[in-house]
Amino acid sequence: MARFPEAEARIFKKYVCLRCGATNPWGAKKCRKCGYKRLRPKAKEPRGGGR
């Protein structure tokens, strides 16, 4: 995680398209690349564990 809130907001305040994986701005209603309407917020916790 980021060390201060400004950096955390810059890194994590984004949406990710569920169809194509493109990153989109926080206020987006649909994907900028493919137009898909289902977006998820970018994950704040790592997934794999680094093994």
Curated annotation (Swiss-Prot):
Disulfide bonds: none annotated. The keyword Ribosomal protein applies. Signal peptide: none annotated. GO terms for molecular function: structural constituent of ribosome. Keywords: Ribonucleoprotein, Ribosomal protein. SMART domains: Ribosomal_L40e. GO terms for cellular component: ribonucleoprotein complex; ribosome. One of its GO terms (biological process) is translation. Part of the 50S ribosomal subunit. Belongs to the eukaryotic ribosomal protein eL40 family. This is Large ribosomal subunit protein eL40. It comes from Pyrococcus furiosus (strain ATCC 43587 / DSM 3638 / JCM 8422 / Vc1).
